[in-house]
């Protein structure tokens, strides 16, 4: 056991340049590539899922590949705008008040999942209504592939050496470049595993083996609950943002506070879906 711990202990934090590629004066960062990669892989998988009609209610879906192609731009705008605005409002408003141009520096990081989810949700609602699509069906489709983007986003956080964990002496703790002289939990990797890999596998199993997409809203609810539970759990290992610290009692963080309403919303979505059974979407939620 001590030998295994020693092997982990000598593994340093991998110093990876945040800039993946430079073309003249243009620097392409891993952070931006993570968003693009997550969106494109999610789009590709979503196309395959709508082509598999056996997954959907009545073995048919009104969502076409053309709809997905058109929605790709809406999704990107909703995620980026919502993520950036959410981060500014929830985590770091003062620098933007001092210099509004800071809000445009997306390449430096500073994106909020909760804001990105809000932006993406608004984009889905508007897109569904404009195209006459059942909004819960679109929610479910996007939820099935969203963990892919979460996985790549957390890996990018790790490469950037940001959002590291609390001080720890566990065998796999790392000393991050901006984390001081202490070894810390690689909490970005915990989130990549739970919010990304585990949640993705869970949703795919529910959709493909248990036909959860046939009851609109179940997948959306499980995704929201799954993310909220994973985030609350990892927050116990993640260092809170320096400018905020702990909100209450040395344990409650902003990430926890924002995830608690998500958990309630996810449970409501599952309850609503189970109550509706296999009936059609409520008229108030149709596009």
Swiss-Prot record:
Signal peptide: none annotated. Its EC number is 2.5.1.145. The gene is lgt. Belongs to the Lgt family. It is found in: Cell inner membrane. One of its GO terms (biological process) is lipoprotein biosynthetic process. A 1,2-diacyl-sn-glycero-3-phospho-(1'-sn-glycerol) binds at residue 154. Pathway: Protein modification; lipoprotein biosynthesis (diacylglyceryl transfer). It is a multi-pass membrane protein. This is Phosphatidylglycerol--prolipoprotein diacylglyceryl transferase. The keyword Membrane applies. PANTHER family: PHOSPHATIDYLGLYCEROL--PROLIPOPROTEIN DIACYLGLYCERYL TRANSFERASE, PROLIPOPROTEIN DIACYLGLYCERYL TRANSFERASE. Keywords: Cell inner membrane, Cell membrane, Membrane, Transferase, Transmembrane, Transmembrane helix. GO terms for cellular component: plasma membrane. One of its GO terms (molecular function) is phosphatidylglycerol-prolipoprotein diacylglyceryl transferase activity. The chain crosses the membrane at residues 26-46, 71-91, 106-126, 132-152, 187-207, 217-237, 251-271. Catalyzes the transfer of the diacylglyceryl group from phosphatidylglycerol to the sulfhydryl group of the N-terminal cysteine of a prolipoprotein, the first step in the formation of mature lipoproteins. The keyword Transferase applies. It comes from Allorhizobium ampelinum (strain ATCC BAA-846 / DSM 112012 / S4) (Agrobacterium vitis (strain S4)).
């Amino acid at each position: 056991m001590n030998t295994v711990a020693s092997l982990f202990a000598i593994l340093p934090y991998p110093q990876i340049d945040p800039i993946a590629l430079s073309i003249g004066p243009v620097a392409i960062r891993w952070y931006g590539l993570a968003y693009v990669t997550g969106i494109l892989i999610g789009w590709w998988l979503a196309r395959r899922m709508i082509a598999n009609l056996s997954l959907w209610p009545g073995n048919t879906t009104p969502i076409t590949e053309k709809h997905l192609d058109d929605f790709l731009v809406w999704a990107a705008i909703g995620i980026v705008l919502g993520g950036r605005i959410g981060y500014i409002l929830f985590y770091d408003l003062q620098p933007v008040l001092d210099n509004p141009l800071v809000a445009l520096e997306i390449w430096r990081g500073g994106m909020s999942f909760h804001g990105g989810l809000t932006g993406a949700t608004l984009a889905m609602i508007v897109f569904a209504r404009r195209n006459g699509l059942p909004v819960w069906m679109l929610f479910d489709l996007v939820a099935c592939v969203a963990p892919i983007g979460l996985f790549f986003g957390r890996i990018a956080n790790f490469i950037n050496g940001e959002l590291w964990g609390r001080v720890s002496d566990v065998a796999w703790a790392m000393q991050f470049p901006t984390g001081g002289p202490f070894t810390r939990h690689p909490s970005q990797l915990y989130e990549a595993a739970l919010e990304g890999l585990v949640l993705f596998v869970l949703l795919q199993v529910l959709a493909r083996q248990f036909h959860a997409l046939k009851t609109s809203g179940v997948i959306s609810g499980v995704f929201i609950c799954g993310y909220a539970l994973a985030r609350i759990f990892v927050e116990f290992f993640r260092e809170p943002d320096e400018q905020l610290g702990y909100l209450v009692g040395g344990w409650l963080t902003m990430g926890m506070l924002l995830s608690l309403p998500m958990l309630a919303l996810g449970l409501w979505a599952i309850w609503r879906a189970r109550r509706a059974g296999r009936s059609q979407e409520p008229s108030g939620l149709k596009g």
